[in-house]
Amino acid sequence: MAPSIAQNGHVNGEVEEVLWKKSIHDPLNWEMAVDSLRGSHLDEVKKMVDEFRKPIVKLWGETLTVAQVASIANADNKTSGFKVELSESARAGVKASSDWVMDSMSKGTDSYGVTTGFCATSHRRTKNGGALQKELIKFLNAGVFGNGTESTHTLPHSATRAAMLVRINTLLQGYSGIRFEILEAITKLINSNITPCLPLRGTVTASGDLVPLSYIAGLLTGRPNSKAVGPSGSKLDADEAFRVAAVSGGFFELQPKEGLALVNGTAVGSGMASIVLYDSNILAVMFEVLSAIFAEVMNGKPEFTDYLTHKLKHHPGQIEAAAIMEHILDGSSYVKAAQKLHEMDPLQKPKQDRYALRTSPQWLGPQIEVIRAATKMIEREINSVNDNPLIDVSRNKAIHGGNFQGTPIGVSMDNTRLALASIGKLMFAQFSELVNDYYNNGLPSNLTAGRNPSLDYGFKGAEIAMASYCSELQFLANPVTNHVQSAEQHNQDVNSLGLISARKTAEAVDILKLMSSTYLVALCQAIDLRHLEENLKSVVKNTVSQVAKRTLTIGAIGELHPARFCEKELLRVVDREYLFTYADDPCSSTYPLMQKLRQVLVDHAMKNGESEKNINSSIFQKIGAFEDELNAVLPKEVESARALLESGNPSIPNRITECRSYPLYRLVRQELGTELLTGEKVRSPGEEIEKVFTAMCNGQINDPLLECLKSWNGAPLPIC
């Protein structure tokens, strides 16, 4: 976050000393920007989650974080209470700038927005500063709400709370000419969970977010059109809002510059951007873990995470993404099992996994870097002084500039939205492989788990939904900031469109949450299918072995039969054949298992030579007995094994419990109560996905996600 020069001793001594040192040794702020990116992205996300949960946010003016803004914004979703506190040490600086405005007014000093008109009409002059502020708030109340407290034309209340917090933080720095009592009143509104109603649209975030912020000012001044929403969701007028929040002294009569101080800032755009980035950072880490789980259930080759590969590419986001995936896969029971599969007939299998898995660190790395850089840019913005003019008490002057231009918001939100769309594209590519039996290394088509695949289409509808989500997300990736229109009589001829871009990015976050929850449920389905596969294949293998011993070992008169040598190859067929190609009817002659088992016997018979002419040594003569016995036994054994698994008593436990990715599976299956989806059950995929989506939205998923990575030391595995 960007430090300002402490002019009136209104930050505590320790912070002030640090800020002065930085201003001397790092006058361009580049060193501070670089320092803010030290350490891993994961450590930063852990810190965000911890900050989000703290019940108290203390404002100094220059230390606010994205996580703190998101915390206050989402107060409705927090089980514990919350409170915003203002640093008392800031009072003197705030008062000094307010006094300066009143003194300059009394001396007849000409100052923008105090004695002049606004924007393109600043050539007008007045000595009635209070009336001018009143008119400012009135003409900026140009928004449209529609009907209802949360209509499609009302800014989400979370974004409004974020804007209130950020605006207080800016004004605390003492450059804006506003009374401390007004900041205390806004704080009381936040702490009482009273949220002014702001219009969703109507700002270009260029002279700040003028129109929406004017509705906060309207509530503070008691405008009759002002509305707020109380703690219970009821609609309040200004009188009721002040009473519930215990704001004493009545409505504020704005002094010169105070109206401008309230509305001329970027708080709505940067507040919403803070909410968006808190979620975006978590979603980025989540997808790193989901990509590793994808590698597990797809029997992927883990060498794509090897440190040397990524070290030679140099990009820190890529290196960290690979290291996190490597950590999840290191020691994974799935990886160990997959290694054995890859050793079987290696020349008949692809040497490499497809790009959606193999290049996932290279794809994700730049997106993480973009999101992290955007987070730092917004943290600098929410700690900036962004109104006009700035009151420099130390030099006894008002400085006219353009810090209200919200370009950092528009640019960072456009970039973040593009990064989210890229994450979504990779997620869809992985999902498409996961549900397609041509690519998913033996999982059933559509991840169907029922007994009758003709009446079970699993995740087919979910795949269509994912295509829809991904398409909308790709559309949202289009930039907002290249659609600028010259505004306000060509005075605001360039404008940032910061809030519009933040709103579109909030939409992108919601869509990526839909995709992530759908994908996570599908991955859990795949995990359970691998468990089912392992149990059923074990039964098939044992049954084939037993039937082979019973029917192929002994001849008609008790002698050892040459067919006994077929057993090893029969079991190799079972090992090689994907279970779900025959599991619904294991002895069907149209399915590959029985066809290939018969072919083994036929091949041996063809090699049996003259012995085939002897009925007692003929292998052909044994085929019928072998198949009849298998037909009588195998379907029952397979069904019995399936029933044991469904009752919670499988002979082989689920491998996922031995993996670092287990906490996410545990959340989905145990804590949220989802289950393996089959055609026989009434529950639909959407019902299960809804549970995970809700958990994602209320933060319930954060602890299990971070638990997956709790033992990571922040470095890749050494090159051996």
From Swiss-Prot:
Its main location: cytoplasm. It is found in: Cytoplasm. (E)-cinnamate binds at N264, Q352, R358, N388, K460, E488, N491. Pathway: Phenylpropanoid metabolism; trans-cinnamate biosynthesis; trans-cinnamate from L-phenylalanine: step 1/1. Its EC number is 4.3.1.24. Contains an active site 4-methylidene-imidazol-5-one (MIO), which is formed autocatalytically by cyclization and dehydration of residues Ala-Ser-Gly. The active site is at Y112 (proton donor/acceptor). There is a cross-link at A206-G208 (5-imidazolinone (Ala-Gly)). InterPro entries: Aromatic_Lyase (IPR001106), Fumarase/histidase_N (IPR024083), L-Aspartase-like (IPR008948), Phe/His_NH3-lyase_AS (IPR022313), Phe_NH3-lyase (IPR005922), Phe_NH3-lyase_shielding_dom_sf (IPR023144). SUPFAM superfamilies: L-aspartase-like. It catalyses: L-phenylalanine = (E)-cinnamate + NH4(+). It holds the Pfam family Lyase_aromatic. It comes from the Eukaryota. One of its GO terms (molecular function) is ammonia-lyase activity. GO terms for cellular component: cytoplasm. Keywords: Cytoplasm, Lyase, Phenylalanine catabolism, Phenylpropanoid metabolism. One of its GO terms (biological process) is cinnamic acid biosynthetic process. The modification 2,3-didehydroalanine (Ser) is found at S207. Homotetramer. NCBIfam families: phe_am_lyase (TIGR01226). This is a key enzyme of plant metabolism catalyzing the first reaction in the biosynthesis from L-phenylalanine of a wide variety of natural products based on the phenylpropane skeleton. PANTHER family: HISTIDINE AMMONIA-LYASE (PTHR10362). Belongs to the PAL/histidase family. This is Phenylalanine ammonia-lyase 1. It comes from Solanum tuberosum. The gene is PAL-1.
